[in-house]
């Protein structure tokens, strides 16, 4: 009886393993069969057949294979009835693989080749979105961010009534926030460097000012001017006030009063725009110290 039970357990275990082996074998067979079929298609000279195969692969979500075939036929199909579709599909194949730079290149190629094509609106939109998805973090070079903004703005100009206009505008706002963050980080770096001479700003005659606060002020002011509706406006404004005050404290005597007065003016501007700021205690302290210095100077 004991051996009978053990035999049944062994038989069941063996059957389970065999089932798994069969499933794996079937999957592997299908995979190699699919690879073999694709390699055969690559060797075909019939570009129409390759195009139909590419459409089939694309429809099944096999974008890498679709792209490989479309790369071979897209130039041949240019000027034919399938020219537009093949080029747009190639761009989408790369887009769906998250190869956004290549995708944007082909979307751009499409709308320049077919400015009134049936996919032109989608091509312009996806070209901008592809560049948007590829933009780097704020600390890095933002050249691609400017390019993405330009592409999305062009989309909105060409298709002002598009259903995708709102999404395009939101992407532009997001990209602008990234540029603001870049400026903010630069301004903050200048502020933190302070009087470090190795990276100090200079006067018109080439003399070292002995601080980086002027560079911080200029960078912060430009950010507020270029992006007046940024969500980081308060953070940039407090940095600007701090820099003006520190510039005043570090200035030579003949410039100190003027710069302290500029810090006081900045205080009023900050209080007017952010009356309930979380930095209220700090800005009041800056105002008190700057005012005290100016008062003592004129007593």
Give a label for each model feature.
Residues 2-35:
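Sec-dependent bacterial lipoprotein signal peptides
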Residues 2-5, 31-299:
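Acidic, polar-rich low-complexity tracts and alpha-helical solenoid repeat scaffolds
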């Amino acid at each position: 009886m004991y051996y009978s039970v053990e035999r049944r357990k062994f038989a069941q275990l063996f059957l389970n393993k065999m089932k798994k082996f069969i499933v794996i074998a079937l999957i592997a067979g299908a995979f190699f069969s699919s690879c073999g079929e694709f390699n055969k298609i690559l060797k075909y000279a019939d570009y129409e057949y390759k195009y139909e195969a590419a459409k089939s692969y694309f429809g099944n979500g096999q974008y890498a294979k679709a792209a490989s075939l479309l790369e071979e036929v897209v130039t041949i199909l240019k000027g034919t009835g399938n020219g537009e579709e093949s080029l747009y599909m190639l761009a989408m194949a790369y887009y769906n693989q998250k190869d956004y730079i290549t995708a944007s290149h082909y979307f751009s190629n499409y709308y320049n080749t077919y400015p009134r094509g049936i996919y032109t609106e989608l091509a312009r939109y996806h070209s901008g979105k592809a560049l948007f998805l590829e933009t780097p973090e704020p600390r890095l070079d933002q050249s691609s961010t400017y390019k993405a903004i330009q592409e999305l703005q062009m989309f909105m100009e060409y298709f002002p009534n598009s259903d995708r206009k709102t999404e395009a505008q939101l992407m532009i706002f997001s990209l602008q926030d990234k540029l603001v963050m870049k400026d903010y980080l630069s301004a903050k770096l200048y502020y933190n460097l302070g009087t470090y001479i190795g990276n100090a700003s200079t006067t018109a005659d080439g003399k070292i000012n002995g601080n980086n606060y002027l560079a911080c002020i200029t960078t912060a002011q430009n950010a507020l001017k270029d992006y007046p509706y940024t969500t980081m406006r308060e953070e940039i404004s407090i940095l600007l006030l701090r820099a003006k005050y520190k510039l005043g404290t570090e200035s030579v005597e003949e410039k100190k009063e003027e710069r302290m007065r500029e810090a006081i003016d900045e205080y009023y501007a900050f209080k007017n725009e952010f009356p309930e700021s979380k930095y209220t205690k700090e800005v009041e302290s800056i105002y008190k110290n700057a005012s005290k210095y100016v008062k003592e100077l004129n007593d």
